[in-house]
UniProtKB/Swiss-Prot annotation:
Disulfide links within the chain: none
Function: DNA-dependent RNA polymerase catalyzes the transcription of DNA into RNA using the four ribonucleoside triphosphates as substrates.
EC id: 2.7.7.6
Subunit structure: In plastids the minimal PEP RNA polymerase catalytic core is composed of four subunits: alpha, beta, beta', and beta''. When a (nuclear-encoded) sigma factor is associated with the core the holoenzyme is formed, which can initiate transcription.
Any GO MF annotation of the entry: ribonucleoside binding
Name of the molecule in the record: DNA-directed RNA polymerase subunit beta
Domain of life where this protein originates: Eukaryota
Length: 1071
């Protein structure tokens, strides 16, 4: 966090700083730590030795730029070179070469990675910290049972428990347990050492009978007993080296390796002084843990809170990349050993270059970024989404929890989260509480803990000093929850009582007992929550919805900044990287839509701008220049605004005139009524870019061809293709049009030709085409303008590297019925009707309202912040002011929010000479008129300017209909989902509903013709064309036949019979 000469000043830290620091730590420390673990490799005769000189490794600067890597679908990575030596011990010769061992993906300026042209981000994982934890549970008799859990660095767990007779057991599996004496002996201690290193030797001697003495008489006996219990082996196993190795691999390596964090935690919890370099569990640790467990039983010591953040650690991008690098080096070691053995066997010449392959490192990182749950595709819906995605904290992933097994206690807010993890911003649904977001000022410390900044309070001086505290330290201090404004730095009276936090409790205590105070009103919140004005007036559930929905806002074609916003809007837009920023001061000598040329310090710098780039959510990323030619600029000044930014500030939506009133039922249950002005004036118009791609392969019959000459297709469908067979730039394409013409060769026998084909060949000698048409066609709902075509040819040109053609089509989408809109307070709704301007309710000055919300959506949801924002937005619009709202302003003055809003409305009423803006009888409300009749409504209505967002959930992406399509092979029923042109499921309850209305024929159609009756649905088409009567299906549908076959597979025969009405003869029919 930057500091300047004024000690009392601070700035908001870079929001991507955590990602940058993690990657730098991996490059500076992690690489070398893993390199030092790489052993010297010898052959079986110990005549040849291979080793890496890791101190001289080199990371080469990437050959391509970030933008080119995205364009050409490549990985933005750095090549890693290491000097390697091959030593012949007999001749004492050494050959040294610098070898290439693989590519390491590099982090770019946004804190993300580019892998195969796709932006990916590695999110932080929060895990239980390795160490020892004590807890108490009640058994079935209601008696407290004390246990200690030792968690290893790998996540393995070992438990020590004490029974009613004060005997201590180590649980080695879910059902098996062994004596603590056997475990200590198996780890290498004898009885004398055990009794010398414990505080209660008499308790250990009390459960030492003759059988126990025999078990711990020697290390071999203890290991055999341990192995017998651990592996659940009967009989009398024999001690051997392989038995020790199996026990080492399956138990000790997974459950006893603490790591440096675990060793530190173990030393602090058990008051030990074992060196930090000793990261393995020792007999001394186990005996000290047993002593503490005995103390717990007799009421000494404190239990651990497993959900406290001091008992958690953050697994950052550095740890994940370092783990993968270590895995790659292990694979490299195995490959080198195999290559040396093979080369000696076949008497080949050995060099360091041909011993090492780069595939181990490259494929390890490719599989990590492609398959690991914590490596995710960067969500680029809008700038806020990009910056928030990298600050997520997840309990899920390898070594973590799952959404179905996590308890409520883990998901809940904990007092230690204060200033570190946002109490509001989390996902909805099954992962609620398991995926959180870092608070604005939080940072990750050296030991993997989350640290938060505070100011130290000096009673007799006015100077302030900022300190970062980990969760284990701040519970020893009294922390005032107010910031500098609330605590009145000019001089606080000694008798003043202030709210404070001490040892996970929230208290009100005297000012002279305060040790620390907060530095910022938004310190406790994440970026998403801190963008909500008047958040203190909202229910927490609605604030959660709002922080999630702001990330779903679509960048609009013309953005507008909010009239009432929070203080973090500029910092979020700046750190997202969507705006172009001057890297040095100078003068603008040229500007257009593609680039800005800057002259400064004798150099000319060309800054390329993003032009209609597609994000992975199909939104449009675009930059608009904000500087004119000849203008002098300073370093850090905004040169071009990106998507959803205005003047370098976040602008996700639009300020529109809203009214809270019912209107003919069209805003029932969160529906929203809007004016046609929002459509015709492109208020909520957005651009979306879709990508369509096709690949050409080399088949067994020959290579596929891209061509514009496609037989059997109408010329109308091929009208946009150029002579290469690819759609021309700037073409307007509709559903079904050909984007890329492609022919796939196929073999055709003489017998497979149709009769007319054979006749043409015999009479006219015309060669019938043997190629199949496999063109790229525009699917349903894809109409638009072609803005880019990319033909990507991979190097090598083999059949394993197919050519790829990508077509990008831009769509202009106005707001329409079915689209989803939302405010910043969790007030979301679906557009139900677009009303003409003259029919909308209008104000006393004749201005028609833009949106009508349901007033019943406010009291029950308790998101009253939207009312304050609505009224303050109206005042700001009339006074041409923008407001920055600090949260929890009631701490400065009672009813501070209401006083601010009413005073601004009163001033706006005076300056504009419009008394209806602020009427004392019903402040904030106004009499408005029905646009259809011109009569005033009975009650005054709340009107104002709200900041409303258009969300990514749009009706064009959701609406779907099916006449006929594909069927599942087994059940013969229509497929599921819009992408597969699927059908609508008619389940059991839907059938009941139709039966209740007595619509027998419709129900029969749904269950037969429209579903899985094969013969009946084939006959429907023919009878419909000729105008005949649709025949009634006679036999059973395919799903019933499937059921019969399933029963037959279980040796249950099921048949049905037809009984004649005339002579009651039974005709047996096979199902």
């Amino acid at each position: 966090m930057p500091r300047d000469g004024n000690e009392g000043m601070f700035t908001i830290p870079g929001f991507s700083q955590i990602q940058f620091e993690g990657f730098c730590r991996f490059v500076d420390q992690g690489l070398m730590e893993e390199f030092h673990k790489f052993p010297k490799i010898e052959d079986t005769d110990q005549e040849i030795e291979f080793q890496l000189f890791v101190e001289r490794y080199q990371l080469v600067e990437p050959l391509i730029k970030e933008r080119d890597a995205v364009y050409e679908s490549l990985t933005y990575s750095s090549e890693l070179y290491v000097p390697a030596g091959l030593i012949w011990k007999t001749g004492r010769d050494m050959q040294e070469q610098t070898i290439f061992i693989g590519n390491i993906p590099l982090m770019n300026s946004l804190g993300t990675f580019i892998v195969n042209g796709i932006y990916r981000i590695v999110i932080n994982q929060i895990l239980q910290s390795p160490g020892i934890y004590y807890r108490s549970e009640l058994d079935h008799n209601g008696i407290s049972v004390y246990t200690s859990t030792i968690i290893s660095d790998w996540g393995g767990r070992s438990e020590l428990e004490i029974d009613r007779k004060s005997r201590i057991w180590a649980r080695v599996s879910r059902k098996q347990k062994i004596s603590i004496l056997v475990l200590s002996s198996a780890m290498g201690s004898n009885l004398r050492e055990i009794l010398d290193n414990v505080c209660y030797p008499e308790i250990f001697l009390s459960f030492l009978n003759d059988r126990e003495k025999k078990k711990i008489g020697s290390k071999e006996n203890a290991i055999l007993e341990f192995y017998q219990q651990f592996a659940c082996v009967g009989g009398d196993p024999v001690f051997s080296e392989s038995l020790c190795k199996e026990l080492q691999k399956k138990f000790f390596q997974q459950r006893c390796e603490l790591g440096r964090i675990g060793r530190r935690n173990m030393n602090r919890r058990l008051n030990l002084d074992i060196p930090q370099s000793n990261t393995f569990l020792l007999p001394r640790d186990v005996l000290a843990a047993a002593d503490h467990l005995i103390g717990m039983k007799f009421g000494m010591g404190t239990l651990d809170d497993m959900n406290h953040l001091k008992n958690k650690r953050i697994r950052s991008v550095a740890d994940l990349l370092q783990d993968q690098f270590g895995l790659a080096l292990v694979r490299l070691e195995n490959a080198v050993r195999g290559t040396i053995c093979g080369a000696i066997r076949h008497k080949l010449i050995l060099t360091p270059q041909n011993l090492v392959s780069s595939t181990s490192l490259t494929t390890t990182y490719e599989s990590f970024f492609g398959l690991h749950p914590l490596s995710q595709v960067l969500d680029r819906t809008n700038p806020l989404t990009q910056i928030v995605h990298g600050r997520k904290l997840s309990y899920l992933g390898p070594g973590g929890l799952t959404g179905r097994t996590a308890s409520f206690r883990i998901r809940d807010i904990h007092p230690s989260h204060y200033g570190r993890i946002c109490p509001i911003d989390t996902s909805e649904g099954i992962n609620v509480g398991l995926i959180g977001s870092l608070a604005i000022h939080a940072r990750i410390g050296h030991w993997g803990s989350i640290e938060s900044p505070f100011y130290e309070v000096y009673q007799r001086s006015k100077e302030t000093k900022m300190v970062f505290l980990s969760p284990s330290r701040d519970e020893y201090y009294t922390v005032a929850t107010g910031n500098s404004l609330a605590l009145n730095r000019g001089g606080i009276q000694e008798e003043q009582i202030v709210p404070a936090r001490y040892r996970q409790e929230f208290l009100t205590i005297a000012w002279e007992q305060i040790h620390l105070r907060s530095i910022f009103p938004f310190q406790y919140f994440s970026i998403g929550a801190s963008l909500i004005p008047f958040i203190e007036h909202n229910d927490a559930n609605r604030a959660l919805m709002s922080s999630n929905m702001q990330r779903q806002a679509v960048p609009l074609s013309r953005s507008x900044x909010x009239x009432x916003x929070x203080x973090x809007x500029x910092x979020a837009a700046l750190d997202s990287g969507v705006s172009a920023i001057a890297e040095c001061e100078g003068k603008i000598i040229y500007t257009d839509t593609h680039k800005i040329v800057l002259s400064g310090h004798g150099d000319t710098i060309s800054i390329p701008l993003v032009m209609y780039q597609r994000s992975n959510k199909n939104t449009c990323m675009h930059q608009n220049p904000q500087v004119r030619r000849g203008k002098c600029i300073k370093k850090g000044q905004i040169l071009a605004d990106g998507a959803a930014t205005v003047g370098g500030e976040l602008a996700l939506g639009k300020n529109v005139l809203v009214a809270y009133m019912p209107w003919e039922g069209y805003n029932f249950e969160d529906a929203v009524l809007i004016s046609e002005r929002l459509v015709y004036e492109d208020i909520y118009t957005s651009f979306h870019i879709r990508k369509y791609e096709i690949q050409t392969h080399v088949t067994s019959q020959g290579p596929e061809r891209i061509t514009h000459e496609i037989p059997h297709l109408e010329a109308h469908l091929l009208r946009n293709l150029d002579r290469n067979g690819i759609v021309a730039l700037g073409s307007w394409v509709e559903t079904g049009d050909i984007l890329v013409g492609k022919l796939t060769p196929q073999t055709a026998n003489e017998s497979s030709y149709a009769p007319e084909d054979r006749l043409l060949r015999a009479i006219l000698g015309i060669q019938v085409s043997t190629a199949k048409e496999t063109c790229l066609k525009l699917p349903i709902g894809g109409r638009g303008r072609v803005i880019d075509v990319r033909w990507i040819q991979k190097k090598g040109g083999s059949s394993y590297n197919p050519e790829t053609i990508r077509v990008y089509i831009s769509q202009k989408r106005e707001i329409k019925v079915g689209d989803k809109v939302a405010g910043r307070h969790g007030n979301k709704g679906i557009i139900s009707k677009i009303l003409s301007r003259q029919d909308m309710p209008y104000l006393q000055d004749g201005t028609p309202v833009d949106m009508v919300f349901n007033p019943l959506g406010v009291p029950s949801r308790m998101n009253v912040g939207q009312i304050f924002e609505c009224s303050l937005g109206l005042a700001g619009d009339l006074l041409d002011r923008h407001y920055r709202i600090a949260p929890f302003d009631e701490r400065y003055e009672q009813e501070a929010s209401r006083k601010l809003v009413f005073s601004e409305l009163y001033e706006a009423s005076k300056q504009t000479a419009n008394p209806w803006v602020f009427e004392p009888e019903y402040p904030g409300k106004s009499r408005i008129f029905d646009g259809r009749t011109g009569d005033p409504f009975e009650q005054p209505v709340l009107i104002g300017k709200s900041y409303i967002l258009k969300l990514i959930h749009q009706v064009d992406d959701k609406i779907h209909g099916r006449s006929s399509g594909h069927y599942a092979l087994v059940t013969q029923q229509p497929l599921r989902g819009r992408a597969k042109q699927g059908g609508q499921r008619v389940g059991e309850m839907e059938v009941w509903a139709l039966e209740g209305f007595g619509v027998a024929h419709i129900l029969q159609e749904m269950l037969t013709y429209k579903s899985d009756h094969i013969r009946a649905r084939q006959e429907v088409l023919g009878t419909t064309i000729i105008g005949g009567t649709i025949p009634t299906p006679e036999d059973a549908p395919e799903s019933f036949r499937l059921l019969v076959r399933e029963l037959r597979s279980l040796a249950l025969e099921l048949n049905h019979f037809l009984v004649s009405e005339k002579n009651f003869q039974i005709n047996r029919k096979e199902a």
